[in-house]
UniProtKB/Swiss-Prot annotation:
Recorded superkingdom: Eukaryota
Protein name, per record: Cytochrome c biogenesis protein CcsA
Its membrane topology: Multi-pass membrane protein
GO cellular component term, pick one: plasma membrane
Function: Required during biogenesis of c-type cytochromes (cytochrome c6 and cytochrome f) at the step of heme attachment.
Organism (species): Nicotiana tomentosiformis (Tobacco)
Length: 313
């Protein structure tokens, strides 16, 4: 009873903080000058991280098993993983661009998990026989950590593509404008050229930083995903007598692995780095959500215990 009450309190606290942080983020999108307001939202995510940690520990103690047995618990753990990846660059200060892009992922995932949409599966239940194994922690935690890291790295790649596209478009417009105005501005030409060069240099540095960190985060996520798939195969052999069954979840996890293996392969070719590899990662972003949510909508296969409630099927 005590743990249930504590879990209820932590859930409402985290949802309240997330609601406030979402509001702050929307305001900062409109007003960039409010630095203190943005910093408050960052601290709010950190507080949410500790609330989620407390929620997971409380649920673990009350249920007697690691909280990764259904969709709700996996969403909470995914939100926790996003928050963990978010706060590391936040404290490093020199990679704040990561926290700005990753932060909203933690916010919206936690907001969805603690909202009333998944109320039916908030209550902890006894594990089904297939999940009563020590492999639960190893397999599912590695998969969720892998999904979180891959999603974050893919978001960085999406941001890279957006900036690259805008950069190329504005370069075209500005170059034409410069050619037209240079005949009339006279002494202002050098000043305009310097401003254009400085802005272009900043964007180039930003693109390089996004490309660098996207590669590092995706590499980490790919490692987690590989460990998760291999441990899942061993667990499947113990539970069902076969390492691989081409279950919908297994199939899409394999497709996800292939897509990001292609991404890492493109990184070995210097000519394919940057926008080309970012396109592959962006495709992987969609594939992960299909694997994580889309397959759950079907509610079939050996992983059907992680599906949506019956009202959503």
């Amino acid at each position: 009873m005590i743990f249930s009450t504590l879990e209820h309190i932590l859930t409402h606290i985290s949802f309240s903080i997330v609601s406030i942080v979402i509001t702050i983020h929307l305001i900062t999108l409109l007003v960039d000058e409010i630095v203190k307001l943005y910093d408050s939202s960052e601290k709010g995510i950190i507080v949410t991280f500790f609330c989620i940690t407390g929620l997971l520990v409380t649920r673990w103690i009350s249920s007697g098993h690691f909280p990764l047995s259904d969709l709700y618990e996996s969403l909470i753990f995914l939100s926790w993983s996003f928050s963990l990846i978010h706060i590391i660059p936040y404290f490093k200060k020199n990679v704040l661009i990561l926290s700005k892009i990753i932060g909203p992922s933690a916010i919206f995932t936690q907001g969805f998990a603690t909202s009333g949409i998944l109320t039916e599966i908030h209550q902890s239940v006894i594990l089904v026989p297939a999940l009563q194994s020590e492999w639960l922690i190893m397999h599912v935690s590695m998969m969720i950590l892998g999904y979180a890291a891959l999603l974050c790295g893919s978001l960085l790649s999406v941001a890279l593509l957006v900036i690259t596209f805008r950069k190329n478009r504005q370069l075209f417009y500005k170059s034409n404008g410069f050619l037209n105005e240079s005949f009339f501005l006279g002494e202002n030409v050098l000043q305009n050229t310097y401003f254009f060069s400085a802005k272009n240099y900043y964007r180039s540095q930003l693109i390089q930083q996004l490309d660098y960190w996207s590669y590092r985060v995706i590499s980490l996520g790919f490692t987690f995903l590989t460990i998760g798939i291999l441990s899942g195969a061993v667990w499947a052999n113990e539970a069902w007598g076969s390492y691989w069954n081409w279950d919908p979840k297994e199939t899409w996890a394999f497709i996800t692995w292939i897509v990001f293996a292609i991404y890492l392969h493109t990184r070995t070719n210097r000519n394919l780095r940057g926008a080309n590899s970012a396109i592959v990662a962006s495709i992987g972003f969609l594939i992960i959500w299909i694997c994580y949510f889309g397959v759950n909508l079907l509610g079939i296969g050996l992983h059907s215990y992680g599906s949506f409630p019956s009202t959503f099927n």
